[in-house]
Design a protein with these regions (language model features):
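Intracellular juxtamembrane helix-capping segments at the cytosolic ends
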Residues: 139-152
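Short amphipathic helix-loop junctions that connect adjacent transmembrane helices
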Residues: 53-70
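Structural signature of the two symmetry-related core transmembrane helices
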Residues: 101-116, 193-196
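Helix-to-loop junctions at the C-terminal end of transmembrane segments
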Residues: 85-98, 183
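Paired small-residue
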Residues: 113, 124-132
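Juxtamembrane intracellular "pre-TM" segments in multi-pass secondary transporters
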Residues: 8-36
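Pair of pore-lining "gating" transmembrane helices in MFS-fold secondary transporters
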Residues: 29-50, 131
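C-terminal membrane-cytosol helix-exit motif in multi-pass small-molecule transporters
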Residues: 1-14, 202-210
Length: 216
């Protein structure tokens, strides 16, 4: 379908850009770009860190054994549903008040919402908190892409966006590994608290980048 129905106009870059190019070492705003790559990783890590423990954790919250798998599915889906609902709205808001500001607020909100997830007493409380966390995280991907587009020379946008996607896949890889390790060695509630600390550290880093950008 994509091959037959979509026609793309290819614009060759100017000769000067093609000849000169821009290497990673000469990339302007390298710190900002690295921060965005790490933020994309954190987004996936936050969503996937509970995957290894979710069924076992829900079992401690749900008395009816026949409902465990269903509630665990709701928990995993809730964050994605929240992100679907909020992504467009947060992207528009970021265009008005600043992408780095939204990223900082989103990471802070998600990090704080992870703390009560460690102390819930029912499966539906966990579903609600994961949904709210998804609402917060929904603005990250459009904001990350926008920051990269604004800070990277035209000839490198595709390359850096490729790194961004790779970082997100790395988060999908690291998240379950971290969740399984922490859950197995420390405890399931510690998974939520550890993920919270990581997201809040990411929020602090983005806030620092935002302050530095504002003073320039």
């Amino acid at each position: 379908m994509t091959l037959t129905l979509i026609r793309e106009e290819v614009h060759k870059p100017a000769d000067t850009v093609a000849k000169t190019g821009v290497s990673w070492s000469l990339l302007p705003a390298r710190t900002v770009i690295i921060c965005m790559l790490c933020t994309g990783l954190l987004l996936m890590l936050a969503n996937m860190s509970i995957e290894p423990i979710i069924t076992v954790y829900v079992r401690t919250l749900v008395s009816d054994a026949s409902q465990i798998t269903k509630v665990a599915g709701y928990v995993m889906a809730a964050a994605a549903l929240g992100s679907i609902i909020s992504a467009s709205w947060l992207g528009k808001l970021a265009d008005r008040i600043g992408h780095l500001r939204i990223i900082t607020l989103a990471l802070t909100a998600a990090g704080l919402l992870l703390i009560p997830q460690a102390f819930v007493t029912s499966g539906w409380q966990l579903v609600a908190l994961r949904f709210l966390m998804g609402l917060a995280l929904g603005g990250l991907l459009p904001c990350i892409a926008a920051v990269i587009r604004h800070r990277v020379p035209e000839g490198m946008v595709g390359s850096i966006l490729g790194y961004s996607v790779a970082a997100q896949f790395a988060g999908q890889f690291i998240g379950p590994l971290m969740g399984g390790f922490v859950g197995g060695h420390i405890g399931m509630r510690a998974v939520f608290l550890a993920t919270s600390c990581i997201l809040l550290a990411g929020a602090a880093w983005n806030f620092k980048i935002h302050r530095q950008s504002a003073t320039r």
